[in-house]
Amino acid sequence: MNTPSNVAYQVMWNRMISVVEEQAQALVRTAFSTSVREAGDLSAGVYDTAGQMLAQAVTGTPGHVNAMADAVGHFIRRIGRENIFEGDVYITNDPWEGTGHLHDITVVTPSFHKGELAGFFGCTAHIVDIGGRGFGADAASVYEEGLYIPIMKLVNRGEVDQTLIRIVRG
């Protein structure tokens, strides 16, 4: 019988948590945002091919977990499963389909094994300056918070889409 034992399941679970925790730690080490580097205002997760969250890193902000749990499903629906390729990177700060507010940016990458979609990795990080008046009492509308980035491809099959880059650099 080839059914994994409880010990094997626990080893696999610990490995998955280790991988997603390393994802979060890499983000902390390389972040430009002081909110990420010093306050840990981020979240990292691993997802199955349907966009269901399998695990979330221990490092980060628990407040991101609800938005992160639903986000990848929105990415799959907006991008279209038939348009998901190796080398892609997706991005958004859509407060309704990914982040909670414009100052949180979510990045999702599909993961492939032998040319077949195996799952997704996603992370959300707080960006202090996204333009606008800022979130909170000063902003009367979400559109006053700053730049709104709809769910889109930032990288298509390994090639950076310069449109968003040019808009941000403005």
Give the label of every model feature segment:
Residues 2-69:
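Long, charge-dense accessory insertions within large macromolecular proteins
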Residues 25, 30-33, 52, 69-110:
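Conserved mixed alpha/beta core segments that line enzyme active sites in large multi-domain catalysts
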Residues 35-39, 81-84, 100-102, 114-115, ...:
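Solvent-exposed alpha-helices and their adjacent loops that cap or buttress functional pockets
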Residues 46, 55-57, 85-86, 90-93, ...:
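General beta-strand structural signal in soluble alpha/beta enzymes
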Residues 48, 112-113:
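Short, acidic, Ser/Thr-enriched surface-loop or helix-capping motifs
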Residues 62-74, 128-137:
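A short, polar/charged loop-to-alpha-helix boundary motif
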Residues 63-67, 98, 158:
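Hydrophobic core positions in small helical hairpin nucleic-acid-binding modules
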Residues 114-170:
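Mobile "lid/hinge" segments at catalytic clefts and subdomain interfaces of large enzymes
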